[in-house]
Structures are given as C-alpha cells and as structure tokens.
A protein has these predicted regions:
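FAD-binding core/adjacent interface of flavoenzyme oxidoreductases
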Residues: 2-7, 62-133
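Beta1-alpha1 glycine-rich phosphate/pyrophosphate-binding loop at the start
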Residues: 2, 7-64
Length: 133
C-alpha cells in the first residue's frame, strides 16, 4: 500500500445500479469515485464486446459518467481489503488495487452495487445441449 485517497462517495460496482447511483448523487456536488473490476462499466447486464449493441440507456449512462466533472470512474480496479474508518463518521476504508498500484480509499459514504450473479440450480438433464434453466 503506497498511498491513500479520499472522496465523498465511493461506489463499488459500475453496473446499472452503480452508474445510476453515481448519476443520482452527482448533482449534490460530492466527489464521487466508482470502482469496478471489469475494464468497461456496465456490469453483467450491460456487457461490452464484439457484436454487442448496448441498449440506449447503457450508452447514455456511460456518456454521462465520462462527462461529469465530479465522477471518477476506475475500471480494472478491485477491492482487496477492508479497513476501519479514517475519521469518525466515515465509511470503512477500502483497500483497492489496479494493474499498477494498491491504495487505501477513504470516503464519507459507501454504496455497494456488487451486481448480478448467475444462480445455477441443477436438475435432471440440466447439462444437456440446448437445455437452460
């Protein structure tokens, strides 16, 4: 850990919920940081890639995040640990890392938008080709 940074609001997850939370909070003037381990915002729901056409709302949210002066988006960044608050009344400190460094991220507020996960429920024949459930 070689440094510490501070923001007013830290959002973990840049999927639809994380992007919406940041855009809803942005008019307050807070310094907002969003972290996500994916290389592009959108989460599991709004994935980016070859042959994928993003829904208009996904493109609007991405564009708005990129343009907003008090939103900092850190893609390719993972939460690797949790520490105590930096000051009384603060949220817990998150320990973050990207490809080049690790640091402590202090914030007054923390929103966890850690996203959707597929839930596999095994049933007879569930591994056969063409079967989904």
């Amino acid at each position: 850990m070689n440094s510490a940074e501070r923001c007013d609001l830290l959002i973990v997850g840049a999927g639809p919920a994380g992007m919406a939370a940041a855009l809803a909070a942005a008019p307050t003037g807070m310094a907002i940081t969003i972290v996500d381990d994916n290389i592009h915002p959108g989460g599991q729901i709004w994935r980016d890639g070859p042959g994928v056409t993003l829904p208009p709302l996904a493109r609007q949210h991405r564009d708005a995040l990129a343009r907003h002066p008090n939103i900092r988006l850190l893609c390719g960044t993972r939460v690797v640990g949790l520490g105590g608050p930096a000051a009384p009344g603060d949220a817990p400190t998150l320990l973050l890392e990207d490809a080049g460094r690790g640091w402590a991220q202090h914030s007054q507020r923390l929103i966890l938008c850690n996203g959707a996960r597929e839930l596999l429920l095994p049933f007879p024949g569930w591994t056969l080709p063409g079967v989904t459930g």
